[in-house]
Every structure is written in structure tokens, then in C-alpha cells.
């Protein structure tokens, strides 16, 4: 693990590429352990890295030594994410790229739905928006380039494919992913103690709630 300071109160801990589920599991377990450590204010997970925010004026050298020791003693088996099922309505006005994705892969919309809803995905990280899950585990034969021209508005709840990943937009925003459906499930609720439905390390299964072709 490489540990580099990025400010007076933050360091980035990164692993060598490429990102993998094994390395992400290590980072998830490490982040959970760090949350109970003294002087650590926040831990933000990324892809193949995490950022540790500390109280101001924490000495860098002792901090790095402590992080290295904790990393060496890490027990990944202690980490267990949750499993969440998310209902999806595929196609229709809210999944308007489904036909284009099917054409790109020279198959039918029904087959795309089947391939997308069969796997169990893993939340690699939360980013872009509060609660936006970057999901690993998309079958290689569903990898699809992003749209050449991003949309100025993607409705909240939209389910899309972007390259080798799939995800869900918690809020309305611009976006360039291929939209294949939508969910009514809220991914963010500021009134909850844990406002994001999904967290890094959770697993997700899409359930076909409906099909609009």
C-alpha cells in the first residue's frame, strides 16, 4: 500500500492497479476498521484507494506508521456486506436506450434484460452523487460504451450501463450512461441515520418488476 499526504489533514492510501474485487474487499475492511480509530475523522472509499481525513496537526510520520501496521494486521474475513434486492422496470421512456444496447450487442431487448438481471453485483464504491453505486460484476457481453452525447437530464432512479459497470442515478442530473430501466426504490434519504441505501461492499440483485417494450 502506498500512502501519500494530500493536505495537512488527509492522506490517500492506494493499491497498485488494476482494481479487483479482492483488493476492494481489503479496502472495505480497512475502512471499517479505521472508522473506530482515534484522530480519524472520516474515511472515503474510492476505486483501488481510500482517503483518510484526520484531525488537524496530526503528525504525518506516526500516522503512516499506524496505518501501515493496521494494514499488515488486517483481517478481511471480518468484513461482511449486506445483500439488497432492487426492483427494476426495464425499457419504456425511462429505459430508452434498451433497444440501442440490444442492437449494439446484436441481440434482443429481452436478452439484455435477462443478462442484466441474472448476476449478483458488488458495490465497489459510492461516488458521482450521494448514494450513486458503482457496481462491479456486469457480464462482459454487456459492456457498452457510454453515449456519444450525454443527456442534460437523467431522471432519478434511472438504471444504466457505462462501459464495464452498471449503476443507478439517485438524483436527476446530467449523465452519459446508457439507460435501460428505472427503479422506484429510493437510494438516498437524508432523514435516515444511514442516508445511503447502498454502501461499498454490499451486493445487489436486480429484480424484474416490469418490462415496457
Swiss-Prot record:
Pfam families: CT_C_D
Keyword annotations of the record: ATP-binding, Hydrolase, Nucleotide-binding
SUPFAM superfamilies: Cyclophilin-like, PH0987 N-terminal domain-like
Catalytic activity, as annotated: 5-oxo-L-proline + ATP + 2 H2O = L-glutamate + ADP + phosphate + H(+)
InterPro entries cross-referenced by the UniProt entry: CT_C_D, Cyclophilin-like_dom_sf, PxpB
Enzyme Commission no: 3.5.2.9
Superkingdom per UniProt: Bacteria
Transmembrane segments: none
Gene3D superfamilies documented for this protein: 3.30.1360.40, Cyclophilin-like (2.40.100.10)
GO MF entries: 5-oxoprolinase (ATP-hydrolyzing) activity; ATP binding
UniProt family annotation: Belongs to the PxpB family.
Record note on quaternary structure: Forms a complex composed of PxpA, PxpB and PxpC.
Role of this protein: Catalyzes the cleavage of 5-oxoproline to form L-glutamate coupled to the hydrolysis of ATP to ADP and inorganic phosphate.
Name this protein carries in UniProt: 5-oxoprolinase subunit B
Lineage: Bacteria, Pseudomonadati, Pseudomonadota, Gammaproteobacteria, Pasteurellales
Name of the gene this protein is made from: pxpB
Amino acid at each position: 500500500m502506498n500512502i501519500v499526504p494530500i493536505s495537512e489533514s488527509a492522506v490517500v492510501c492506494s493499491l497498485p492497479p488494476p482494481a479487483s474485487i479482492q483488493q476492494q474487499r481489503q479496502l472495505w475492511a480497512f475502512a471499517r476498521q479505521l472508522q473506530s480509530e482515534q484522530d480519524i475523522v472520516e474515511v472515503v472509499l474510492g476505486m483501488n484507494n481510500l482517503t483518510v481525513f484526520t484531525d488537524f496537526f496530526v503528525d504525518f510520520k506516526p500516522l503512516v506508521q499506524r496505518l501501515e501496521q493496521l494494514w499488515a494486521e488486517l483481517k478481511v474475513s471480518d468484513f461482511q456486506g449486506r445483500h439488497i434486492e432492487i426492483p427494476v422496470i426495464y425499457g419504456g421512456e425511462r429505459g430508452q436506450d434498451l433497444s440501442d444496447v440490444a442492437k449494439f450487442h446484436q441481440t434482443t431487448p429481452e436478452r439484455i434484460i435477462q443478462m442484466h438481471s441474472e448476476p449478483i453485483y458488488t458495490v465497489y464504491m459510492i461516488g458521482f452523487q450521494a448514494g450513486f453505486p458503482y457496481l462491479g460484476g456486469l457480464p462482459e457481453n454487456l459492456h457498452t460504451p457510454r453515449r456519444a452525447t450525454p443527456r442534460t437530464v437523467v431522471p432519478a432512479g434511472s438504471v444504466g450501463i457505462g462501459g464495464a459497470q452498471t449503476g443507478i442515478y439517485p438524483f436527476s442530473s446530467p449523465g452519459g450512461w446508457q439507460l435501460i430501466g428505472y427503479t422506484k426504490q429510493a437510494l438516498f434519504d437524508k432523514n435516515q441515520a444511514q442516508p445511503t441505501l447502498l454502501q461499498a461492499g454490499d451486493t445487489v440483485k436486480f429484480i424484474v418488476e416490469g418490462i415496457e417494450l
